[in-house]
UniProtKB/Swiss-Prot annotation:
Signal peptide: none annotated. It is linked to Orofaciodigital syndrome 19: A form of orofaciodigital syndrome, a group of heterogeneous disorders characterized by malformations of the oral cavity, face and digits, and associated phenotypic abnormalities that lead to the delineation of various subtypes. OFD19 is an autosomal recessive form characterized by tongue nodules, dental and digital anomalies, narrow high-arched or cleft palate, and retrognathia. Some patients have notching of the upper or lower lip. This is Sodium channel modifier 1. It comes from Homo sapiens (Human). GO terms for molecular function: enzyme binding; zinc ion binding. Residues 76-106, 129-186, 200-230 are annotated as: Disordered. The lineage of its organism: Eukaryota, Metazoa, Chordata, Craniata, Vertebrata.
Amino acid sequence: MSFKREGDDWSQLNVLKKRRVGDLLASYIPEDEALMLRDGRFACAICPHRPVLDTLAMLTAHRAGKKHLSSLQLFYGKKQPGKERKQNPKHQNELRREETKAEAPLLTQTRLITQSALHRAPHYNSCCRRKYRPEAPGPSVSLSPMPPSEVKLQSGKISREPEPAAGPQAEESATVSAPAPMSPTRRRALDHYLTLRSSGWIPDGRGRWVKDENVEFDSDEEEPPDLPLD
């Protein structure tokens, strides 16, 4: 950046130099470490007591002090872990995985030691095969051959035995598969029953027919028609 001078006024040159120095100093100060007030002065945002300074040169001198440096360390010590967590979540996950991998052998070893100490008895394994144990010899049964005459008698008895009768289910299935033909009288009785029911007559349970109260009859007959003989 170049400055253009007008005339030979040394005071103007000093003002320009001071402004240039102030711009250079301000470029090295982060925005979150200093605040510019309305009256043109500067306040330090790092120190807890918020000192107010008149010029950038005074702010630069304050920033070089021990109190400001200690406050700066505390400020970034609290702020940096949060930034790292927000910016690098993947890195944090990788570090956790590495820690778990490093601790895994120790955990497995301690787990095995505790299990072996608690379980004194051998573990049951379902894949193990049962060892062969010779069975105790039972009472010997003499299988003497039968004479040929007895063999013939036994075979004759077996051939003469009748076959077992079929159960009730088989009889029912036979009757269902082959229904008996209906007689004419039975058919007439069934037709008469259906006509009475369709006309509005209902049986009272005593062998008589009674008019249904919910049905309207055309005639005033109190007795149902008789069963036709033909």
